[in-house]
Amino acid sequence: MQAIRAERLARTLGVSKGSFYWHFADISALQTAMLTHWEALATEQVIGATDSAGGNARVRLTFLTDTAASDRSDAYGGLATEAAIRDWARHDPAAAKILGRVDARRQDYVVGLFKEAGLAPNSATRAARLLYGALVGAEHLLQSPREQVRQDLQHLLTKLLLPD
């Protein structure tokens, strides 16, 4: 993200450099706004949509994995955006902080769904960690057909929901 320059960005968008600085104090402020926007879209809106889908916890877990592996995720930045932000966070402490907050929020939500589905707390935490790890890993399978990724995630979810 070091390559972002206000003048170049303004020119690309067809606005003045002054217009950029009217909205953002500096490039760092733009980056923070981008990450905060992504956090809201890719976390809170996804959780809201999952809860709004209704049904029991298993139905909502299925909806969540379907959303993550489908083109519906494009509305939330998509798999490529998520992978780029994770790469960015490896080199930028501010991005890493927001990504850490996103990961914690998402995992807590999924742990809650697994508990609601009847898993014991330790099993729910382990299942959530495994499912979330698979979802994050799916970001790097962009060459795989989304339907195949969706089916694989559903298979994993079925296995994780089995009683101990």
Predicted features along the sequence, with ranges:
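Helix-turn-helix
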Residues: M1-A33
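Residues in soluble alpha-helical coiled-coils and helical-bundle/repeat scaffolds
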Residues: A25-A29, A33, D51, G55, ...
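Hydrophobic alpha-helical connector segments
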Residues: A33, I47-L79, L131
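Short, basic, alpha-helical segments at the C-terminal edge of helix-turn-helix-like DNA-binding modules
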Residues: T36-T43
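Amphipathic alpha-helical packing segments from all-alpha helical-bundle domains
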Residues: T43, A75-A83, H91-G118, N122-R129
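Generic hydrophobic alpha-helical segments
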Residues: V46, I85-R86
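Short amphipathic alpha-helical interaction/hinge segments
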Residues: V46, R72, Y76, V110, ...
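Hydrophobic/aromatic-rich alpha-helical bundle segments in the mid-to-C-terminal region
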Residues: A96-G100, L113-D164
